[in-house]
Amino acid sequence: MRSRLLLPVPHLPTIREMSEELSHGAAGQEPPASPSLDDYVRCICQLAQPTSVLDKVTAQSRPNRPSRPAWTREKRRQAESPGDSSLCVSSLQPTLPSPGTDNPLDWLFGKSQGEQADGRGRPNRTGSSDPWDVPRQMGKDTGRLCEARVPEHSLGRKPGPRHQTSDLKSWTSRKSCRALASVSSSRPSSILGTLYLHLPVIHEL
């Protein structure tokens, strides 16, 4: 079944058949000549030619703009003062080391260290005069925030199980801190007694 379907399909011509048809089929017409070596080299030279050369050729073919008269250029140069140009040149040129210095690296590092020292010596007067005012103010603000926090059970609400566990953890941490402070201040003989007194009591559920 499959072979019967493929039989009426015309096959594509091969390369040999195409060349034979071109050579023998066209009567009285010569086949096109193959490109010679000179044509090949000429095409390569055209492809390898840079675009800048083409741009120059197109620019030369365009009509040139009318040039400004020389007296306008002279007026413009006279308008610019020589002092301004000297200032611009002096600002652009960096300061060179003195001829007495042996190593230019020593001069360069000495200059950078001097600039850093000048920057440190100048106080930052944009804010307050005391640099410790900002941390103190932040500490006061955090203290106020801590004082503003009120436990929920003091407002008449029943503490939930999560709040109870958090309160228990905070209470144990406070007790341990107090115990450590008392241990550091007490005598070695009373260390065990203070530890037993301040240890938290765990109730069985």
UniProtKB/Swiss-Prot annotation:
Induction entry: Up-regulated by hypoxia.
Compositional bias ranges of the Polar residues kind: 55-64, 83-101
Biased composition (Basic and acidic residues): 138-155
Entry keyword set: Autophagy, Cytoplasm, Mitochondrion, Peroxisome
Segments for region (Disordered): 55-171
Keyword Mitochondrion annotated: yes
Residues spanning the membrane: none
Gene Ontology cellular-component annotations: mitochondrion; peroxisome
GO process terms (BP): autophagy; regulation of autophagy
Superkingdom of origin organism: Eukaryota
Localization (cell): Cytoplasm; Peroxisome; Mitochondrion
Function text: Acts as a critical modulator of FOXO3-induced autophagy via increased cellular ROS.
Designated name of the protein: Protein DEPP1
Organism expressing this protein natively: Mus musculus (Mouse)
Organism placement in taxonomy: Eukaryota, Metazoa, Chordata, Craniata, Vertebrata
